[in-house]
């Protein structure tokens, strides 16, 4: 199975799930030169999120994904996926919740994107918590 076929299938699966329960937020995080750089930034993003906003969950890792689990209680999780497309890492973020609090899911997604963007800008600063 090619990466493109896998991602297409994943996209269809996410769209089908979105139609059933609006518990998903998917964000394109741009592109990076290597998967290694993508994975490093993904892990740093999840670690920075926990440092600022808390969350007693765990971080799962595979060859090309980083999962931040229990980012808001045990109902909001996030995956940063680092596939290779046309020779570049093409990361995207999926945040999902298992309850009906879609606003909380959206807030977690925004915070993760902000941290990711700050890393790409070379800022290195961790955002301060805002309510």
Cite the ranges covered by each PLM segment.
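Bacterial N-terminal signal peptides that target proteins for export
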Residues: 1-10
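N-terminal signal peptide c-region/cleavage motif recognized by signal peptidases
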Residues: 16-18
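Ser/Thr-rich, low-complexity intrinsically disordered terminal regions
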Residues: 22-27, 31, 35-125, 129-130
């Amino acid at each position: 199975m090619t990466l493109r076929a896998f991602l297409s299938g994943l996209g269809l699966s996410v769209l089908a799930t979105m139609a059933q329960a609006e518990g998903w937020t998917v964000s394109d995080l741009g592109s990076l030169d290597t998967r290694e750089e993508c994975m490093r930034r993904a892990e740093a993003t999840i670690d920075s999120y926990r440092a600022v906003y808390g969350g007693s969950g765990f971080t799962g890792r595979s060859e090309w994904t980083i999962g931040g689990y229990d980012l808001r209680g045990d109902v909001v999780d996030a995956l940063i996926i680092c596939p290779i497309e046309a020779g570049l890492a093409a990361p995207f973020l999926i945040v999902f919740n298992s309850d009906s609090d879609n606003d909380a899911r959206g807030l977690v997604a925004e915070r993760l994107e902000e941290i990711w963007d700050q890393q790409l800008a070379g800022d290195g600063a961790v955002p301060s918590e805002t309510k």
